[in-house]
A protein has these predicted regions:
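Active-site or metal-binding loop neighborhoods of secreted/extracellular toxin and effector enzymes
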Residues: 1-21, 95-183
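Catalytic zinc-binding patch centered on the HExxH motif and its immediate surroundings
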Residues: 30-72
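Second-shell loop/turn segments in exported
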Residues: 2-3, 63-68, 89-92
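Active-site recognition of the HExxH zinc-binding catalytic motif
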Residues: 76-89
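Hydrophobic beta-strand residues in large extracellular and virion-surface proteins
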Residues: 13, 17-20, 38-40, 59-61, ...
Length: 183
């Protein structure tokens, strides 16, 4: 069951948000969320590292790793879930929203030196290379090829296997909007 955050957990969240705020895209995301009143709760029993519910505006975090001084996993999870909170929720394109969020997290992690030891990211790296820094497609054939490979990767993961994908939603609009004024 969910519980409110302890002061140690809040400190972790504040540190992660401060780090994110030092990144152009992360700062834009935090700025866009200031009036959203997102609630953050802890639930060690969820399947994913984090979940965002657009109906309740609630973010659930699985693990705060209180024993560690810094928590890059939490920072990555917060970045991912906060990005979801800015996306236009669409059950028919849920997998597209995941791919967009994972791509943004991949680029954030590269900028911040955060490790991504996860097989999900091998084709995301290649998908990223088909886009410029503002998420515009620079090589359509590569983009379509690697987007399909990323879909195939995600469909092998239990958590995502039933998520719907829509070819018309392969646009990265949330990322484009956040990155447009970043260098």
């Amino acid at each position: 069951s969910t519980s409110s955050l302890s002061s140690a957990q809040w400190k972790k969240v504040e540190d992660a948000l401060a780090n994110m705020n030092n990144d152009c895209m992360g700062g834009k995301m935090i700025g866009a969320l200031k009036d959203k009143n997102i609630t953050i709760v802890h639930d060690p029993n969820i399947k994913a590292n984090g979940l965002y519910n657009p109906k309740t505006n609630q973010m659930t975090i699985k693990d705060f790793k209180e024993s560690e001084v810094t928590n890059k996993d939490l920072e990555r999870t917060l970045f991912h879930e906060l990005l979801h909170s800015l996306q236009t929720h669409n059950e028919d394109a849920k997998l597209n929203l995941e791919i967009e969020a994972h791509l943004a997290v991949y680029r954030y992690a590269v900028r911040k030196g955060i490790s991504l030891a996860d097989s999900k990211y091998s084709n995301i790296l290649l998908l990223s290379k088909s886009l410029d820094e503002k998420y515009n497609v620079i090589d359509a054939d590569l983009y379509n090829d690697f987007y399909q490979k990323v879909i195939n990767d995600f469909k092998k993961i239990d958590f995502y296997k039933d998520f719907k994908e829509s070819p018309s939603a392969r646009n990265m609009n949330t990322n484009k909007n956040l990155a447009k004024d970043c260098e």
